[in-house]
């Protein structure tokens, strides 16, 4: 019963769940012909919180092993075998550290943040995204080039944590076990080895600000994405257990390694000049030292907080062809599905795939440029196809990619073929 009249004629309201009157509780909230008191709300919150903690505990129990992590990465990312192995071990150790961090007071495990070095389009971002999806943890991505020191026009480094909170509906506990990927980290290197009077608001200063987040601090974040002001209550997010993955191309870094090895009399300089890019990348993995990154422009403290290094190789033609067709979410499969929704089969001939890969290599965009090439060659067909009838297959060959001719259209009537395409 929601309420009844007392002697004064005033109607007394009761909680529909526990039966307490409005005089026995601090607050009674009304809904459509139903009431709930603050005590019942608190009880409901406790029940939901316990269920969330149980789910989190269950997820931790199912932490995939390094070989299982690697297998999942293989499903979505082509090549980069060494980087996958490094990432699989680092991520596994990080979440095992979270799981057992408070159970043994004798040895404290340091956080293993990761630095990915590789050219544009080599798979750095995709690797980080795939790891977060596999582990079912919040994932946020930031571009280091947009970050500035606090007080300057630009994006505050603490906005990164705000993005992470947004991905998990401002669940602080969940956000504190998430993964943050910071791209273009090489673009915030110190502009010169000697500090100058001019303020470097997007270089060393940003490294100093990021350093606090990466090594572990309690960040104050405005709730629900609001702007900061003095009277506002902030959400407190502990970043000690957030895994930070930083990525960058670090163009020219091999010159620093080469100069150091030559200076040390190790005789690596001449072979380095003769080797192709793949061999150079392999040599870097074996010989890159923290001092090379410091000489490049990262401050020593920042390098020290990124102890795990994974080097990604530049993708060759064969790797780009595999990226087009092999992964679970391969681009060719995605476009074939789009065409299938129109009841049409999309076919790419082998020479067309090779031509697409060559065009991406020429643009020096790696795998990142593949989608724009596909969109360009299929745009007119995707525009016209919904208004056409009788088409059962679209065939893309090398001429479509290289010369810009239209794809071959095959109709239900086998004799009727689009004659605008050369035989």
Curated annotation (Swiss-Prot):
Subunit structure as annotated in this protein's UniProt entry:
Component of the ClpX-ClpP complex. Forms a hexameric ring that, in the presence of ATP, binds to fourteen ClpP subunits assembled into a disk-like structure with a central cavity, resembling the structure of eukaryotic proteasomes.
GO function terms (MF aspect)? ATP binding; ATP hydrolysis activity; ATP-dependent protein folding chaperone; protein dimerization activity; unfolded protein binding; zinc ion binding
User: What Pfam families does the entry give?
Assistant: AAA_2 (PF07724), ClpB_D2-small (PF10431), zf-C4_ClpX (PF06689)
Q: Which domain of life is it from?
A: Bacteria
Positions binding ATP in this chain are: 119-126
Organism of derivation: Acidithiobacillus ferrooxidans (strain ATCC 23270 / DSM 14882 / CIP 104768 / NCIMB 8455) (Ferrobacillus ferrooxidans (strain ATCC 23270))
Chain ranges of the ClpX-type ZB domain:
3-56
**Name of the protein described by the UniProt record:** ATP-dependent Clp protease ATP-binding subunit ClpX
Q: Which InterPro entries match?
A: AAA+_ATPase (IPR003593), ATP-dep_Clp_protease_ClpX (IPR050052), ATPase_AAA_core (IPR003959), Clp_ATPase_C (IPR019489), Clp_protease_ATP-bd_su_ClpX (IPR004487), ClpX_bact (IPR046425), P-loop_NTPase (IPR027417), Znf_CppX_C4 (IPR010603)
**What function is annotated for this protein?**
ATP-dependent specificity component of the Clp protease. It directs the protease to specific substrates. Can perform chaperone functions in the absence of ClpP.
PANTHER family (alphabetical): ATP-DEPENDENT CLP PROTEASE ATP-BINDING SUBUNIT CLPX-LIKE, MITOCHONDRIAL (PTHR48102:SF7), ATP-DEPENDENT CLP PROTEASE ATP-BINDING SUBUNIT CLPX-LIKE, MITOCHONDRIAL-RELATED (PTHR48102)
* Keywords annotated in UniProt: ATP-binding, Chaperone, Metal-binding, Nucleotide-binding, Zinc
Provide a GO CC annotation, any one. HslUV protease complex
Q: Record's family?
A: Belongs to the ClpX chaperone family.
Q: Which residues bind Zn(2+)?
A: 15, 18, 37, 40
Q: Does the keyword Signal apply?
A: no
Q: Does the keyword Transit peptide apply?
A: no
Q: Name one GO biological process term.
A: cell division
């Amino acid at each position: 019963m929601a309420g009844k009249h007392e002697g004064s004629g005033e109607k007394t309201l009761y909680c529909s769940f526990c039966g307490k009157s409005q005089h026995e509780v601090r607050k009674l909230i009304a809904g459509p012909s139903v009431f709930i008191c603050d005590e019942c709300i608190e009880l409901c919150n406790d029940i939901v919180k316990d269920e969330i903690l149980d789910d989190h505990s269950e997820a931790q129990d199912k932490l995939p092993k390094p070989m299982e992590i690697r297998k999942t990465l293989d499903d979505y990312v082509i090549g980069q075998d060494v980087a996958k192995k490094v990432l699989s071990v680092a991520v596994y150790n990080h979440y095992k550290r979270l799981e057992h961090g408070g159970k043994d007071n004798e040895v404290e495990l340091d956080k293993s943040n990761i630095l990915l070095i590789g050219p544009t389009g080599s798979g750095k971002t995709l690797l980080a995204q795939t790891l977060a999806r596999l582990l079912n943890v919040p994932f946020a991505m930031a571009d280091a080039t947009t970050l500035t020191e606090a007080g300057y026009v630009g994006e505050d480094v603490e906005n990164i944590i705000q993005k992470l909170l947004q991905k998990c509906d401002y669940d602080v506990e969940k956000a504190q076990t998430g993964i943050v990927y910071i791209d273009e980290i090489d673009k915030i290197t110190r502009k010169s080895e000697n500090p100058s009077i001019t303020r470097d608001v997007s270089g060393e200063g940003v490294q100093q600000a990021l350093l606090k987040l990466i090594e572990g601090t309690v960040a104050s974040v405005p709730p629900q994405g609001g702007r900061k002001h003095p009277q506002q209550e902030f959400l407190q997010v502990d970043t000690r257990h957030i895994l930070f993955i930083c990525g960058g191309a670090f163009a020219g870094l091999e010159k620093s390694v080469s100069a150091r090895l030559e200076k040390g009399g190790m005789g690596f300089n001449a072979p380095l000049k003769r080797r192709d890019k793949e061999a150079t990348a392999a040599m870097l993995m074996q010989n890159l030292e923290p001092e090379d990154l410091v000489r490049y422009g990262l401050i020593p403290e920042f390098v020290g907080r990124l102890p795990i290094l994974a080097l990604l190789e530049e993708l060759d033609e064969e790797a780009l062809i595999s990226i087009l067709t092999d992964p679970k979410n391969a681009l060719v499969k995605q476009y074939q599905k789009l065409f299938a929704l129109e009841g049409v089969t999309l076919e790419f001939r082998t020479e067309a795939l090779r031509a697409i890969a060559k065009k991406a290599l020429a643009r020096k965009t790696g795998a990142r440029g593949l989608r724009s090439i596909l969109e360009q060659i299929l745009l007119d067909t995707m525009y016209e196809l919904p208004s056409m009838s009788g088409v059962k297959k679209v065939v893309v060959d090398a001429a479509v990619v290289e010369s810009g001719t239209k794809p071959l259209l095959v109709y239900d009537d086998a004799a009727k073929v689009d004659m605008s395409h050369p035989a």
